[in-house]
Regions:
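Positively charged n-region of N-terminal signal peptides that target proteins for export
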Residues: 1-6
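Hydrophobic core
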Residues: 8-12
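C-terminal segment of classical bacterial N-terminal signal peptides
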Residues: 13-19
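Exported/periplasmic cell-wall-interacting domains
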Residues: 21-49, 54-59, 139, 179-183, ...
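SH3/SH3-like beta-barrel superfamily modules
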Residues: 23-41, 84-130, 328-339
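SH3/SH3-like (including bacterial SH3b) beta-barrel domains
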Residues: 74-87, 310-319
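Short, structured interface segments
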Residues: 106, 117-137, 265, 269-283
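Gly/Pro-biased beta-strand-loop elements
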Residues: 118, 123-229
Length: 363
């Protein structure tokens, strides 16, 4: 299963110093750089470090965007295949460069339903010819982080964490194990635009990051009266639901960000980096400090909010009333839900349940 290989990472490597939470790192080796996706704990406790990871160059396999190359168990074309990597967009972690013209790399396998292999999303190590590898520069205005544990996208701009968006990543099942979203580091490589899914839903503003896996807006079905119906997909934001693509909220955050905003800003920013953190045992989400401000509108809104203004609330009610995160436990606020526009932190009980779900397996 996908999480087994990542659990080995947890046992082999401890997180870097300075992180409040003992979260695992994606990779199993070192690359000799100060900032490296594969060696950085999977959490947001140090946004500056995450930003520096997002702007680093990335090693890719040369080739066409929709082609996979096989990794071999030994440095030989006749060896067993152990995984696959997508050309042009998927980053690999170079562990060793051999004198015989081969390199040992690791990545999350990008096998799909058309592949010869059924290694779906596992962290794998394998060999490929060194001449196939190329280091690519990364655009440095924006950076994106998708966390499969929280089902959130964290949008960075010019060194700062700008906003948080609700997403739905791929949902792998026993019948369709290829439908999970492959973790790793990627470059956005092409603007695809709108397309119709196999179920007949329209997906807008699609951007390619890993072969057939795209960033795109919440799918909608067109009703007979011409109205766009988002309800069947929008209600699943915040949980796994897609067939590999990453669905991104259409409702604007207080900063005005949604999938359309990303499409417009990233149109001339190909090779912006996207990193995807896998939801593996051993990961934890921090509980916000009790004095963290949140905002409410008693009697008029049944949600709590992250900012004093929100697109879910009419401007005549701005600014909303400020309370503390700790006060959400009081009876007056106990039934308020998390706003789907501005995405405030989950309640304590929800975070604790999430952490319990991904608690490391003990001996």
């Amino acid at each position: 299963m996908r999480w087994i290989a990542a659990l080995l990472v947890l046992m082999l490597l401890m997180p870097a110093a300075g992180y409040a939470q003992e979260n695992p790192v994606p990779g199993t080796g070192t690359c000799g750089r100060e900032y490296c996706y594969w060696e950085t704990p999977m959490d947001l406790s140090d946004p500056e470090t995450i930003w520096n990871v997002l702007i680093q160059p990335m090693t890719v396999v040369k080739g066409k965007q929709r082609v996979q190359v096989q990794l071999m168990a030994q440095p030989s074309e006749d060896a067993e295949m152990v995984g696959e990597v997508t050309c042009d967009s998927q980053g690999v972690h170079v562990l060793e460069t051999l004198e015989n013209g081969w390199s040992l790399v690791e990545c999350y396998s990008s096998s799909n339903k058309l592949s010869k292999l059924d290694v779906y999303g596992d962290l794998v190590k394998g060999y490929l010819p060194t001449e196939m590898l190329e280091e690519r520069e990364t655009k440095t205005r924006y950076g994106l982080v998708v966390d499969e544990m929280t089902q959130r996208m964290y949008v960075f701009e010019k060194g700062r964490l700008l906003t948080t968006l609700r997403v739905s990543t791929g949902k792998a099942t026993q019948k369709a194990p290829q439908c999970g979203t492959t973790a790793g580091e990627f470059h956005l490589v092409s603007m695809v635009g709108n397309f119709i899914s196999e179920s007949g839903a329209t997906c807008e503003h699609a951007i390619r990051f890993n072969d057939g896996d795209l960033l795109h807006g919440v799918p909608y079905y067109l009703e007979d009266n011409g109205k766009k119906n988002y309800s069947s997909c929008e209600r699943h934001l915040g949980e796994k639901a897609s067939e590999g693509c990453i669905r991104i909220q259409r409702k604007r955050t207080p900063e005005g960000v949604n999938m359309r905003w990303l499409w417009e800003r990233l149109f001339d920013q190909m090779h912006t980096k996207l990193i995807i953190w896998q939801d593996v045992p051993g990961r934890r989400q921090p509980i916000p400090a009790e004095d963290t401000p949140v905002y409410v509108l008693p009697g008029l809104s049944n949600a709590y909010h992250s900012k004093p203004t929100c697109y879910d609330i009419d401007k005549i009610y701005f600014p909303m009333e400020e309370i503390t995160y700790g006060q959400l436990e009081e009876e007056a606020y106990a039934r308020l839900h998390n706003c789907g526009y501005c995405n405030p932190p989950l309640r304590v009980q929800e975070i604790e349940a999430l952490n319990q779900r991904y608690a490391a397996v003990e001996e």
